[in-house]
Amino acid sequence: MILVLVGPPGAGKGTQAKLLCARFGIPQISTGDMLREAKRSGTLEKRYLDIMDSGGLLPDEAVIGLIARRTVEPDCSNGFLLDGFPRTVPQADALDELLASANQGGKRIDAVIQLDVARPLLEERLIHRRTDKRSGQIYHLVYNPPPPGAELEHRADDRPEAVAKRLDAYEAMTAALLPFYEQKKLLHRVDGVGKPEEVTHRVLSAIGRPGSGGE
């Protein structure tokens, strides 16, 4: 099964990706995680680092190559879930071309899931988000506060000015993506507000897999 999970920053894609991947036994491929790891390891070019820190979206060339290399690894043989890619119609076209290639064995997307969350809630989720420098665990100062002694980091792209820019950029760049997948009858819009398990149940029902994984 090949799933694409889309939604604005703060919609809960990372949480849902982990839950869905556990259900279907497929790996999560997060462009955000891959890019942040490249940033931490010092392998990300400075021009891309500057874009990330300011809350901008990276050009296609910085992302498509990562996806192409990752999706031919052995753990992707039975499918995978893409989190954060594609964001534009050109990226979606490139993904279709990649999946149809000989290296991929003529695969195709099974479903595209859009997590819908109102912008004010997205802003509140992101601005109060913190990351533990040592473990990488993500906390929320209000809803999921960190334990005492956690060494917290406020990501540059989670600061208020960067959050507004990220959401604006997402809305502008993905405006044509959802109609693209809707026309292909692949798009499933799901309310992303609620407990993680509730949202997962909505997703499974939307894609025709209610009760999947023993629920």
UniProtKB/Swiss-Prot annotation:
It is found in: Cytoplasm. It comes from the Bacteria. Keywords: ATP-binding, Cytoplasm, Kinase, Nucleotide biosynthesis, Nucleotide-binding, Transferase. One of its GO terms (biological process) is AMP salvage. Its main location: cytoplasm. InterPro entries: Adenyl_kin_sub (IPR006259), Adenylat/UMP-CMP_kin (IPR000850), Adenylat_kinase_CS (IPR033690), ADK_active_lid_dom_sf (IPR036193), P-loop_NTPase (IPR027417). Pathway: Purine metabolism; AMP biosynthesis via salvage pathway; AMP from ADP: step 1/1. It catalyses: AMP + ATP = 2 ADP. GO terms for cellular component: cytoplasm. Residues 30-58 are annotated as: NMP. The keyword Nucleotide-binding applies. Consists of three domains, a large central CORE domain and two small peripheral domains, NMPbind and LID, which undergo movements during catalysis. The LID domain closes over the site of phosphoryl transfer upon ATP binding. Assembling and dissambling the active center during each catalytic cycle provides an effective means to prevent ATP hydrolysis. Catalyzes the reversible transfer of the terminal phosphate group between ATP and AMP. Plays an important role in cellular energy homeostasis and in adenine nucleotide metabolism. This is Adenylate kinase. It comes from Sorangium cellulosum (strain So ce56). The gene is adk.
